[in-house]
Swiss-Prot record:
Enzyme class: hydrolase
Reactions catalysed: a 1,2-diacyl-sn-glycero-3-phospho-(1D-myo-inositol-4,5-bisphosphate) + H2O = 1D-myo-inositol 1,4,5-trisphosphate + a 1,2-diacyl-sn-glycerol + H(+); a 1,2-diacyl-sn-glycero-3-phospho-(1D-myo-inositol) + H2O = 1D-myo-inositol 1-phosphate + a 1,2-diacyl-sn-glycerol + H(+)
Occurrences of domain EF-hand (ranges): 140-175, 176-211
Name of protein: 1-phosphatidylinositol 4,5-bisphosphate phosphodiesterase delta-1
Task of the protein: The production of the second messenger molecules diacylglycerol (DAG) and inositol 1,4,5-trisphosphate (IP3) is mediated by activated phosphatidylinositol-specific phospholipase C enzymes. Essential for trophoblast and placental development. Binds phosphatidylinositol 4,5-bisphosphate.
Positions with a binding annotation for Ca(2+) 5: 706-708
Gene name linked to the record: Plcd1
Active site: 311, 356
């Protein structure tokens, strides 16, 4: 039952000095502010999955002193967070490190007593994170069940009595009556000692993890045989899984990768265990493995792609009083975001700052944001990053901005047109590794010829920060003086190349735009919807050659989001959402952008790239987009659905909702029945059917909720998959948390078929 030792042995880490130091634990200084540094004891638990942290808070529960390593986004060495940058400059960098979490909880900033101690923690945690990520689904399940066994074994005798068995089932998110639990217990208690140990626990584990629905799928593929031959596996891959590459080569490759039995592997056969391993793997995922890499043509103009874009990137919470943070930029970039917003204002000491103007959100230095962007811009994707500058600065501080941009970003800043690219937008491939600026500009594509100190020129002020559409919002913000014109210095203007901000002047004639290809208009969501309703096809044609940026309405002071789908249907590329706000809109957004290798650029369908297209999502007619398809989805079962309420006695009552997002006529949803008191292995076996007319614009969202008869259902997990990335046959849907992070073992087992 020692899951930690199993983990260390599995990965050859049992004698690793870094992990031995973490298992022993050490005193570290926790840093919260310039006046708050406290010594606390931190220790890796024996399960190698959790860290125990000492707390001096009164009445704090033991569970609240633990955090899971699965919740860690990354471990940073040195002064690499705002906290350590501000509050630990007096401490050498080689003693400082930070634990950054996946969700939006505060970063844990720590100071070790020596550089060696800091190295143990940083390297040890990185090793566990790396090896946990490389575990297959079976290993993750085994590790998780063993850790639940450890928790249930209250007296630590490596045996399990009946009460401990009941506690164990609760840990696994299963509620069973005493009679059924007693029946399982007796079946496994071969020694009749009223406790389970060693092989008896192993027998119990096998009974628990047996999946009848996998057995049925295996029998469907293998017939009466005990194993799957290469020929049978090829037939299964062709007829059930609809694999385009189905053939002996693929079958042998799957046997080689997933078959645990060396004997079966030598005989070129797949056992039931190997079959399950395949179905739980990336090859058995409902999301196409081929789409996990960049596979689309990246040599087309930028306007031909949807671009993952963030609104008010600097905010961690709401738009009126929430904190601004460089960490928000890092999080967005790590999620593949390629267009960030910088709302720039005059700051003290001649240093420009970023915050949500005329509100009480906190302020961060422009230069600090640039350093964070420089360090993280190309970690998740090599393709270009666009910085959307909302410039409200004085002339002097604009010059400071220009100096910082050149000094900090250096050669990665695009500050002149690419050779020969002066008649259309360059491609993502041409702009790889480059940062572009979007903002107000004097003159056209080429620099206006100004030198430092030359005369500034009036341009119209940025409008978005001032857009307060709702009276309730206006009453909550500080007084904003009326200011229609902004003076712009040439040093900053000349850095704007392919993304010159302009006011939209309307469509000059059907199918054409009055804008130059390097000019870019921004639209509030309400104005964009109005344009889509009144001139849907005109908007689509405009977006063939020009970039359009959409941002949330001014009344969304809570940082809520709008649906991006309608904007994408109109060909709009830079559809900016509040990345800090989880919810269905962000689920769909991140689902769309996991396509094409998660690089932040998704090629629009051909009919949204054709300058002569007649497509209009609000008035559908026949055309190349009209490809009716029928989707059948059978929701078979769920696996290891996480507890919503951490209360030990709470067991989830899950139900599954399948949604289609796309053009209006294709949108719909269906839901399963509720399974009571079982989050470990609920079974539904319910089939749904959807008719979709424009599959190129459709996404399928699988959502699991915990049903509550007296209040709103609680969200458990979801996965959103673009239609063209959806795989057919028996598949596992791997569920994500509300923040878009992978649940380690939570899946839905489904059967999918798509027919013309």
């Amino acid at each position: 039952m020692d899951s930690g030792r199993d983990f260390l042995t599995l990965h050859g880490l049992q004698d690793d000095p870094d992990l031995q130091a973490l298992l022993k634990g050490s005193q570290l200084l926790k840093v919260k502010s310039s006046s708050w540094r406290r010594e606390r004891f931190y220790k890796l638990q024996e399960d190698c999955k959790t860290i125990w942290q000492e707390s001096r808070k009164v009445m704090r529960s033991p569970e609240s002193q633990l955090f899971s390593i699965e919740d860690i986004q990354e471990v940073r060495m040195g002064h690499r967070t705002e906290g350590l940058e501000k509050f630990a400059r007096d401490i050498p960098e080689d003693r400082c490190f930070s634990i950054v979490f996946k969700d939006q909880r505060n970063t844990l900033d720590l100071i070790a007593p020596s550089p060696a101690d800091a190295q143990h923690w940083v390297q040890g945690l990185r090793k566990i994170i790396h090896h946990s990520g490389s575990m297959d689904q079976r290993q993750k399940l085994q590790h998780w069940i063993h850790s639940c066994l450890r928790k249930a074994d209250k007296n630590k005798d490596n045996k399990m009595n009946f009460k401990e068995l009941k506690d164990f089932l609760k840990e696994l998110n299963i509620q069973v009556d005493d009679g059924y639990a007693r029946k399982i217990f007796r079946e496994c208690d071969h020694s009749q000692t009223d406790s389970l140990e060693d092989e008896e626990i192993e027998t119990f584990y096998k009974m628990l993890t047996q999946r009848a629905e996998i057995d049925r799928a295996f029998e469907e593929a293998a017939g009466s045989a005990e194993t799957l031959s290469v020929e049978r596996l090829v037939t299964f891959l062709q007829h059930q899984q609809r694999e385009e590459e189905a053939g002996p080569a693929l079958a042998l490759s799957l046997i080689e990768r997933y078959e645990p039995s060396e004997t079966a592997k030598a005989q070129r056969q797949m056992t039931k265990d190997g079959f399950l391993m395949y179905l739980l793997s990336a090859d058995g995922n409902a999301f196409s493995l081929a789409h996990r890499r960049v596979y689309q043509d990246m040599d087309q103009p930028l306007s031909h792609y949807l671009v993952s874009s963030s609104h008010n990137t600097y905010l961690l919470e709401d738009q009126l009083t929430g904190p601004s943070s460089t960490e928000a930029y890092i999080r967005a970039l790590c999620k593949g975001c390629r267009c960030l917003e910088l709302d720039c204002w005059d700051g003290p000491n001649q240093e420009p700052i970023i915050y949500h103007g005329y509100t009480f959100t906190s302020k961060i230095l422009f230069c600090d944001v640039l350093r964070a962007i420089r360090d993280y811009a190309f970690k998740a994707s090599p393709y270009p990053v666009i910085l959307s500058l909302e410039n409200h600065c004085s002339l002097e501080q604009q010059r400071v901005m220009a100096r910082h941009l050149r000094a900090i970003l250096g050669p990665i800043l695009l500050d002149q047109p690419l050779d020969g690219v002066t008649t259309s937008l360059p491609s993502p491939e041409q702009l790889k590794g480059k940062i572009l600026l979007k903002g107000k500009k004097l003159g056209g594509l080429l620099p206006a010829g100004g030198e430092n100190g030359s005369e500034a020129t009036d341009v119209s002020d940025e409008v978005e920060a001032a857009e307060m559409e709702d009276e309730a919002v206006r009453s909550q913000v500080q007084h904003k003086p009326k200011e229609d014109k902004l003076k712009l210095v040439p040093e900053l203007s000349d850095m704007i190349i392919y993304c010159k901000s302009v006011h939209f002047g309307g469509f000059s004639s059907p199918g054409t735009s009055g804008q130059a290809f390097y000019e870019m208009a921004s639209f509030s969501e309400s104005r964009a919807l109005r344009l889509l309703q009144e001139s849907g096809n005109g908007f689509v044609r405009h977006n063939v050659s020009c970039l359009s940026r959409i941002y949330p309405a001014g009344w969304r002071t809570d940082s809520s989001n709008y649906s991006p789908v309608e904007m994408w249907n109109g060909g709009c590329q830079i559809v900016a959402l509040n990345f800090q706000t989880p919810g269905p809109e962000m689920d769909v957004y991140l689902g769309c952008f996991q396509d094409n290798g998660g690089c932040g650029y998704v090629l629009k369908p051909a009919f949204l790239r054709d300058p002569n297209t007649t497509f209009n999502s609000r008035a559908l007619t026949q055309g190349p987009w009209w490809r009716p398809e029928r989707l059948r989805v059978r929701i078979i079962s769920g696996q290891q659905l996480p507890k919503v309420n951490k209360n030990k006695n709470s067991i989830v009552d899950p139900k599954v909702i399948v949604e289609i997002h796309g053009v209006g006529r294709d949108t719909g949803s269906r839901q399963t029945a509720v399974i009571t008191n079982n989050g470990f292995n609920p079974r539904w076996d319910m089939e749904f059917e959807f008719e979709v007319t424009v599959p190129d614009l459709a996404l399928v969202r699988f959502m699991v909720e915990d049903y509550d008869s007296s209040s709103k259902n609680d969200f458990i997990g979801q996965s959103t998959i673009p239609w063209n990335s959806l795989k057919q046959g028996y598949r596992h849907v791997h569920l994500l948390s509300k923040n878009g992070d992978q649940h380690p073992s939570a899946t839905l087992f489904v059967k999918i078929s798509i027919q013309d």
